[in-house]
Regions:
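Glycine-rich phosphate-binding loop of actin/hexokinase-like ATP-binding domains
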Residues: 133-204, 287-290, 295-300, 304-309
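Short, acidic Gly/Pro/Ser/Thr-rich loop/turn segments
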Residues: 27, 84-86, 156-160, 215, ...
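Active-site nucleophile and cofactor-binding loops and adjacent substrate-binding regions
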Residues: 49-52, 94-95, 114-121, 140-143, ...
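Conserved phosphate-binding catalytic cores of ATP/NTP-utilizing and phosphoryl-transfer enzymes
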Residues: 2-12, 112-148
Length: 352
């Protein structure tokens, strides 16, 4: 998780710096600097979105941004990344490549790199999310205040909690996507049996994510004795939107219902009275299906805390610039540790 450090570098706010949000599918990179509007406020000087799989390593992705958009020397970078830090490496099965921090720093000629979890970065941008509100899904229109929960299914399943406090509050990173998937229906039990025929561990991430949606679709085809016609999560969502593939429609329904269970459990765990934000373009693309689904029923269903959960607003918000904004806000607040002592980050992450 992100922690405060006293060795903040002098002069950081005056110098532009790189902020990158690296997920399993997309790499969002910006050139940022502190604005003069207030502490922690940031200004975006340039911004691009890259497809991670098009680059053999992260350094080449970042260099492509520098070559295209950076006209001045930049020596500092904050990296919001889905993954787990092991020594000087960031490792995640959802990333197309391992990230070795000293090699990355050397390849780009940087002085220092700081790292935090991608969903921690998104949570640090929640002030911006509250400003535009996102798209209301269920619950009251406005929150009562309190902890805010951020959840995002993408290449993986990320979650983080923003705790309000003096000075802007702080963020708790989680590995909630790795919690055991708990079926709530006979069909979900059948899917679980297909995903783990010999029993054993199936994390929520293997159901509530892009790859998870595809896995559910394939499982449903097997249950019905049909050969899968679709080979990508995007194809499943498109077919479900059109309503011309029964297994795709059911897969999205199960995905949405399971997301509701996951969100409700976390909202109870963290008493997220400040609201729940569901992040990512993936959810925005199926918003109408999500709105008609069993999400709300499962968010509330069968819980002694139903009265509490019914007072929590749930909104869908775009990922977009939020990750780089949140990473930059964190950076300006905490400063940069050296790459020899990188920030620990939680496993998982949406990897959008």
């Amino acid at each position: 998780v992100a922690t405060d450090h006293s060795n903040r570098l002098t002069g950081i706010p005056a110098a532009p710096f790189l902020a990158a949000d690296i997920g399993g599918t997309h790499g969002r990179v910006a050139l940022m600097r502190a604005s003069h509007d207030g502490a922690g406020a940031v200004q975006t000087l340039a911004y691009r979105v890259f497809v991670c799989a098009e680059f053999p390593m992260l350094s080449e992705l970042l260099q492509a941004f520098i070559d295209a958009d950076v006209k001045i020397p930049v020596k500092h970078c904050v990296l919001a990344c889905a993954g787990q830090i092991m020594g000087n490496e960031v490792v995640n099965d959802n990333l197309p490549w391992p990230i070795h921090l000293p090699q990355l720093r050397h390849a780009l000629g940087l002085d220092e790199i700081a790292v935090l979890n991608d969903f921690e970065a998104l949570a640090y941008a929640l002030d911006d999310a509250s400003a535009d509100g996102g798209r209301h899904l269920c619950g009251p229109a406005t929150p009562t205040g309190g902890p805010t929960l951020l959840i995002g299914p993408g290449t993986g399943l990320g979650a983080a909690v923003h705790i309000p406090a003096a000075g802007g509050g702080f963020v708790l990173g989680t590995e909630a996507g790795q919690m055991d998937f708990a079926p709530n229906s006979l069909r979900e039990r059948q899917i679980l049996a297909h995903l783990a025929p010999d029993g054993g561990y199936v994390p929520f991430e293997h159901v509530v994510s892009g790859p998870g949606l595809l896995a559910v679709y394939v499982a449903l085809c097997a249950i019905h004795g049909d050969a899968p016609k679709l080979a990508a999560p995007e194809a499943v969502t498109k077919a479900a939107m059109k309503g011309d593939d029964a297994q795709a429609v059911e897969a999205v329904e199960i995905f949405c219902a399971s997301l509701g269970s996951f969100a409700g459990n976390l909202a109870m765990t963290f008493m997220a009275t400040g609201g729940v934000f569901l992040a990512g373009g993936f959810l925005s693309s199926i918003f109408e299906l999500l709105e008609r689904s069993a999400f709300e029923e499962r968010f509330l269903h069968g819980r002694s805390a139903r009265a509490l959960l019914s007072q929590i607003p749930v909104r869908v918000t775009e990922h977009g610039l939020r990750g780089v904004h949140g990473a930059a806000r964190w950076y300006l607040r905490h400063g940069m540790p050296g790459v020899g002592a990188p920030m620990p980050i939680a496993a998982g992450g949406a990897g959008a």
